[in-house]
Amino acid sequence: MSGEVPPNINIKEPRWDQSTFIGRASHFFTVTDPRNILLTNEQLENARKVVHDYRQGIVPAGLTENELWRAKYAYDSAFHPDTGEKMTLIGRMSAQVPMNMTITGCMMTFYRTTPAVLFWQWINQSFNAVVNYTNRSGDAPLTVNELGTAYVSATTGAVATALGLNALTKRVSPLIGRFVPFAAVAAANCINIPLMRQRELKVGIPVTDENGTRLGESTNAAKQAITQVVISRILMAAPGMAIPPFIMNTLEKKAFLKRFPWMSAPIQVTLVGFCLVFATPLCCALFPQKSSMSVTSLEDELQASIQRTHPEIRRVYFNKGL
């Protein structure tokens, strides 16, 4: 529908059915669209005004349904779903493809020497720290100490994994060595994400009923949310770090790259970018953004509270983060 917008559209929810993978994928192809990072502050503020006004029943004259959804997705791409704060530019999901294709491409091109491994793993974990903090679930802030611990631990873990595997793969085929950066990234995700979201594991994340009424905070919900994010992030990195090594291993034996070796990095970055354009939204869509769990899976105290005040509720919902 492209005519004037009706007053009863639920723009708190995505445009597509989130109970299906196709619906979630359509949603995340829009959210992770790199063109969103080109939106100006003025455009984002206009989108926020349209969304906030519509939620309060104020419909600007001439606004169409398509324009409303465009405003909603511009708003969602830049503002945190729980806090409403504008997110750091490079931490937004729309920045994932351009940032990751550059960093990952360079990690996979410059992986043979210790200084190169140290530098690019440090760059990657610095970026990951920003992304993980920006896309955390809930509204509980991290302290400077918690941020520092997560950042140092993840960077150390990634570098140690990369250097250790580099040493082990010196006697095997060069193709195997090309997968070292992926192993380091996978290990770092298992460290970085839980540590960057450690406060959620300590105090819990907000859980609500299906209408969004807050029921309390749950650490069990936080564990489920973080596990799902770790899995999706590792799988998100897999195509861009698993497919290009086979292609580059073949290309580097050809006369063209032997004559122009400086072309390795741009080709690798392009290959990674092509993979990430599809892998990023598809892996974000593996689990619903609005995740849920049975009331019986919550902590005993929270279960008792919900059963006392809302005995009809069987499932609770929460933002799993990205």
UniProtKB/Swiss-Prot annotation:
Mitochondrial intermembrane side: 121-146, 196-228, 288-322
Species this chain originates from: Mus musculus (Mouse)
Tissue: Widely expressed, with highest expression in kidney and liver.
BP-aspect Gene Ontology terms: erythrocyte differentiation; iron ion transport; L-alanine transport; L-serine transport; one-carbon metabolic process; serine import into mitochondrion
Principal subcellular localisation of the protein: mitochondrion
UniProt similarity note: Belongs to the sideroflexin family.
Domain of life: Eukaryota
Reported phenotype of the disruption mutant: Defects in Sfxn1 are the cause of a transitory hypochromic, microcytic anemia characterized by a large number of siderocytes containing non-heme iron granules. The anemia begins at 12 dpc, is most intense at 15 dpc and is still severe at birth, but disappears by 2 weeks of age. Mutant adults are no longer anemic, but they have an impaired response to hemopoietic stress. Most homozygotes also have flexed tails and a belly spot.
Keywords of the record: Acetylation, Amino-acid transport, Membrane, Mitochondrion, Mitochondrion inner membrane, One-carbon metabolism, Transmembrane, Transmembrane helix, Transport
Residue ranges, Mitochondrial matrix side: 2-102, 168-174, 250-266
Bilayer topology annotation: Multi-pass membrane protein
The protein, known as: Sideroflexin-1
